[in-house]
Amino acid sequence: GTLGFGLMPLLQEYEVVVIVNTSSDDGKIVGDIDVLSGDELIANQGIKKTANEVEITEMLQICSMANHCAQTSMVSIVPEDIISVHVGVTPALREKWTEYIDVIVDELAKCGINSTRKEFVMGLDEILDQFANPSIEHGKGF
């Protein structure tokens, strides 16, 4: 999920914010990937089916009335089930995962954010395991 009102200071402090998310768009099929600008989200092109989606749109609307709001975009992918709470990636999303990462990296580049592939790359299963089982051990978990 997102930070709710905790998202507001990030939108006001930074020049660029790229939100990586899931989307509950019933008009799309599982694995569809979209990139929407903050303006598109504010104009209600962002779906507001879940609390997560409502929070993003509302924080963008509120921050757009302030002195500063980051140039915002959201890269989202449509999961099979957006309501259930669990950590994992379904086979349908695994098939699209590399494309999803590529779209995210492309969006970062469009925003002037350079990324460099790490020499050692964790596998998706290891990332999910560390997310599901956070640790305070240095370099492990979040």
Model-derived features: where do they sit?
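Fold-independent oxyanion-binding glycine-rich loops
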Residues: G1-T2, V20-T22, G38, I77-V78
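Catalytic-core regions of hydrolytic enzymes
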Residues: G1-V16
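Short, glycine/charged-enriched secondary-structure capping and boundary segments
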Residues: Q12-Y14, G31-V35, G88-P91
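Short N-terminal helix-initiation segments at or just after the protein's N-terminus
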Residues: Y14-S24
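Helix-loop-strand module that forms the ligand-binding subsite of alpha/beta enzymes
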Residues: T22-T72
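Phosphate-binding/catalytic loops
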Residues: E58-G139
